[in-house]
């Protein structure tokens, strides 16, 4: 895949302390992929 596809979402850290995973369309892969939250 060329580059990294990123999605910006707002999340409540109190409700979801674990890593957020979203099934979104990846423009680099041209298909739906699971976009996990990037560890900070």
Curated annotation (Swiss-Prot):
GO biological process terms on file: translation
Places the protein is found: Plastid, Chloroplast
GO terms assigned for molecular function: structural constituent of ribosome
UniProt keyword terms in alphabetical order: Chloroplast, Plastid, Ribonucleoprotein, Ribosomal protein
InterPro entries hit by this protein: Ribosomal_bL33 (IPR001705), Ribosomal_bL33_CS (IPR018264), Ribosomal_bL33_sf (IPR038584), Ribosomal_zn-bd (IPR011332)
Pfam families from the UniProt entry: Ribosomal_L33
GO cellular component, one term: ribonucleoprotein complex
Highest rank taxon of the organism: Eukaryota
HAMAP family per record: Ribosomal_bL33
PANTHER family listed in its UniProt record: 50S RIBOSOMAL PROTEIN L33, CHLOROPLASTIC, LARGE RIBOSOMAL SUBUNIT PROTEIN BL33C
Similarity annotation: Belongs to the bacterial ribosomal protein bL33 family.
Name of the protein described by the UniProt record: Large ribosomal subunit protein bL33c
């Amino acid at each position: 895949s060329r580059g990294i596809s990123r999605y910006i979402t707002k999340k409540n850290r109190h409700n979801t302390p674990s890593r957020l995973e979203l099934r979104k369309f990846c423009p680099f892969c041209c298909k739906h992929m699971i976009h996990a939250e990037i560890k900070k």
